[in-house]
């Protein structure tokens, strides 16, 4: 039996089968030819171009960024108020005894002698120009006149007292300084007619002028030395020469 008559028949069967598959694909897809639609997926193409920017969105809530670096130190502020005092510290230990001042005293003696010599020289100069020295008293005047209370205050300022003669020699020394009436440290302010010195002691020496004291107008409670050397009672509010008495 020959094979060639069967070949056309075989080809016809294959075409019929192929056609049958094509019709079935159209019924399922109903689009492009069955050969393209029913073939295997192709290879992916190149990416397309970027699309246009969309519309601008609404502003978002503020966010918190990363913590920055520490900044430089600021300027110094004003000083604060002083704080309260602290508690007292513990008592320290007793210190060692100090060095003996023997050497210092030996050096001070010559200096002390020099100073005393200078003081004596000044005393002599002052006595010669403005005062008189009698025994252990030095009488000095500044040549001013003032009331009795001011005379007392001025003499006290120099650790002295108002001149008070206790004997004839002292009275003569004061008389040599007087070119006008000078206050003496004698009053009867406490008891009228009873004259005492400024310490309250009764007088053991007096040299009243004739007819004195007379307490004229009942207000003469102080005493002045006249140029003649005699004494006279006067009002304490009157102004007379200042003479102070210094111990020597």
From Swiss-Prot:
Hydroxylation on proline residues within the sequence motif, GXPG, is most likely to be 4-hydroxy as this fits the requirement for 4-hydroxylation in vertebrates. Its main location: secreted. Residues 43-112 are annotated as: Disordered. GO terms for molecular function: D-mannose binding. Residues 49-61 have a biased composition (Basic and acidic residues). Residues 134-245 form the C-type lectin domain. Disulfide bonds join 155-244, 222-236. SUPFAM superfamilies: C-type lectin-like (SSF56436), Triple coiled coil domain of C-type lectins (SSF57944). It comes from the Eukaryota. InterPro entries: C-type_lectin-like, C-type_lectin-like/link_sf, C-type_lectin_CS, Ca-dependent_lectin, Collagen, Collectin_CTLD, CTDL_fold. The keyword Cell division does not apply. PROSITE patterns: C_TYPE_LECTIN_1, C_TYPE_LECTIN_2. One of its GO terms (biological process) is complement activation, classical pathway. Residues 1-20 form the signal peptide. Residues 112-130 form a coiled coil. The coiled-coil domain mediates trimerization. Calcium-dependent lectin involved in innate immune defense. Binds mannose, fucose and N-acetylglucosamine on different microorganisms and activates the lectin complement pathway. Binds to late apoptotic cells, as well as to apoptotic blebs and to necrotic cells, but not to early apoptotic cells, facilitating their uptake by macrophages. PANTHER family: MANNOSE-BINDING PROTEIN C, PULMONARY SURFACTANT-ASSOCIATED PROTEIN A. This is Mannose-binding protein C. The lineage of its organism: Eukaryota, Metazoa, Chordata, Craniata, Vertebrata. The gene is MBL2.
């Amino acid at each position: 039996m020959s094979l060639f008559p069967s070949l056309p028949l075989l080809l016809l069967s294959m075409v019929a089968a192929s056609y049958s598959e094509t019709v079935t694909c159209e019924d399922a897809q109903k689009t492009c030819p069955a050969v393209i639609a029913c073939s295997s997926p192709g290879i992916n193409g190149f990416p397309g171009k970027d699309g246009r920017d969309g519309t601008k969105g609404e502003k978002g809530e503020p966010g918190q960024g990363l913590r920055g670096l520490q900044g430089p130190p600021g300027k110094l502020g004003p000083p604060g108020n002083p704080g309260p005092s602290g508690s007292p510290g513990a008592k320290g230990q007793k210190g060692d005894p100090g060095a003996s001042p023997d050497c210092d005293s030996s050096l001070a003696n010559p200096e002390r002698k020099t100073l005393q010599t200078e003081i004596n020289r000044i005393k002599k100069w002052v006595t010669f120009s403005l005062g008189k020295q009698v025994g252990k008293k030095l009488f000095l005047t500044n040549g001013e006149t003032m009331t009795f209370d001011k005379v007392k205050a001025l003499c006290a300022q120099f650790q002295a007292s108002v001149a008070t003669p206790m004997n004839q020699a002292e009275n003569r020394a004061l008389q040599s300084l007087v070119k006008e009436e000078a206050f003496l440290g004698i009053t009867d302010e406490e008891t009228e007619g009873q004259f005492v010195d400024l310490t309250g002691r009764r007088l053991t020496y007096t040299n009243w002028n004739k007819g004195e004291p007379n307490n004229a107008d009942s207000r003469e409670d102080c005493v002045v030395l006249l140029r003649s050397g005699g004494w006279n009672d006067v009002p304490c509010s009157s102004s007379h020469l200042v003479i102070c008495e210094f111990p020597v």
